[in-house]
Regions:
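A generic fold-level signal
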Residues: 9-11, 19, 76-77, 96, ...
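Residue-level detector of beta-propeller blades
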Residues: 67-70
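Conserved Nudix-box catalytic region and its N-terminal flanking loop in Nudix hydrolases
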Residues: 19-59
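Acidic, metal-coordinating catalytic segment for phosphate/diphosphate chemistry
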Residues: 1-15
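Short alpha-helical functional segments enriched in proximate histidine and acidic residues
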Residues: 60-64
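Short acidic, Gly/Pro-enriched loop/turn segments at secondary-structure junctions
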Residues: 107-120
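Active-site-adjacent beta-strand/loop module that shapes the phosphate/pyrophosphate-binding cleft
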Residues: 72-107, 124-129
Length: 129
């Protein structure tokens, strides 16, 4: 299903969970005290949620997403979550937004200090495994 963002829809966001073997990519936003997040961000007016995800991932971590699987959304904040297993490129951080990244095991990722949005998406992912 394709959702198109229109004027007034300011809280919609797309977040991607990059998976490599049993690892997941988490990122630390620039200026965040200790919280980690997952790549992604706000969807612009006129973009589909997938287009927003592709753009945000390329901007934040320099990875060109090739294929995604839609996982679901958080009803309260309109955050859409995707599983990403195919991409091109190497990680290149946009330091204005992301200051560092880590590949962490899926079975320990919830032990990290995560944003609420990241925690909800990762928990949704773990519930499907």
């Amino acid at each position: 299903m394709k959702y198109e963002i229109k004027d007034g829809d300011t809280s919609w966001a797309a977040k991607g969970m990059f998976l490599k073997d049993d690892l997941i990519l988490i990122v630390k936003p620039t200026g965040s005290k200790h919280r980690y997040d997952i790549p992604g961000g706000k969807i612009k007016i006129g973009e589909s949620k997938e287009q927003g995800l592709y753009r945000e991932c390329l901007e934040e971590v320099g990875l060109k997403v090739k294929k995604v699987k839609y996982l679901g959304k958080n009803e309260e904040r309109e955050k859409h979550y995707f599983i990403i297993k195919q991409w091109d490129g190497e990680i290149v951080l946009q330091l204005e937004e992301i200051e560092k990244y880590r590949w962490v095991p899926l079975d320990t990722v919830l032990q990290y200090y995560l944003t609420k949005t990241a925690h909800q998406g990762i928990q949704m992912l773990l519930d499907t495994i």
